[in-house]
A protein has these predicted regions:
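Redox-cofactor binding/interface segments in oxidoreductases and associated redox assembly factors
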Residues: 6, 58, 167
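A residue-level signal for conserved active-site and pocket-lining positions in enzyme catalytic cores
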Residues: 9, 57, 61, 83, ...
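Short glycine/serine/threonine-rich phosphate/pyrophosphate-binding segments
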Residues: 15, 64-69, 167-168, 175-177
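Gly/Ser-rich helix-loop-strand patches that form or flank binding pockets
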Residues: 67, 72-85
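Gly/Ser/Thr-rich active-site loops/lids in small-molecule metabolic enzymes
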Residues: 158-200
Length: 202
């Protein structure tokens, strides 16, 4: 790997202290490293990632990693997440271990774990998108119920039109809930979320 690109969530690394540290560490090995410019608004940039990049690093939490994976859809680029969030089930490296992680990267001491992604579309609104973790179909109004047909790879799977169902989630083994029930398989789960009303007891 010769060229690296760092995507930073400025809500997590506000002064980019960790980001700059990673950049300097990469450059100390004679490699090139580019930092994504701060977005004009929001946490995530819409800038296209250069084509000649060999590896993308994210600095933030799992949300930063997931957002970056969507932007990289269709490109065969490895990603490594530096965890500055809370859970960190996708971001592999903790902040205190970044220098060792960079050393392993530039020396080629790593393995690449393939991840599947979902492609989803809503035909009636012509909406299409991709996801690393899950796609959720949910109602748009407080008094509306979910009613739709679900197709997977062009084949009809199920109809949803029940009052008790608030939304349906189609997820990969990268989803947070899937860490528990998928056990490193390619299992896809389609889960109904019932509508509950929780009230505090006095």
């Amino acid at each position: 790997m010769e060229k690296f690109y760092i995507i930073t969530n400025d809500m997590k690394d506000a002064n980019r202290k960790i980001t700059v540290k990673i950049k300097k560490c990469i450059e100390s090995y004679g490699k090139k490293c580019y930092l994504e410019e701060r977005p004009e608004e929001g946490n995530f940039s819409k800038i296209k990632i250069p084509k000649d990049i060999d590896c993308v690093l994210t600095v933030g939490g799992d949300g930063t990693f997931i957002q970056a994976s969507r932007r990289l859809f269709g490109r065969d680029l490895p990603m490594l997440g530096i965890n500055m969030g809370t859970l960190g089930y996708l971001t592999e490296v903790e902040v205190q271990n970044v220098e060792e992680a960079v050393k392993q990267l530039v020396e080629g001491n790593y393995t690449i774990e393939e991840r599947m992604m979902l492609y989803g579309s809503a035909a009636y609104r012509n909406v299409r998108d991709v996801a690393l973790n899950d796609i959720v179909m949910t109602r748009s109004g407080s008094m509306k119920i979910v009613h739709f047909n679900l197709y997977v790879n062009g084949e009809f799977l199920n109809s949803y039109g029940f009052y008790c169902v608030q939304s349906v989630c189609r997820r990969t083994d990268c989803g947070a809930d899937s860490v528990i029930d998928c056990c490193d398989t390619d299992l896809l789960a389609c889960t109904q979320f019932p509508q509950y009303c929780f009230r505090g007891q006095r």
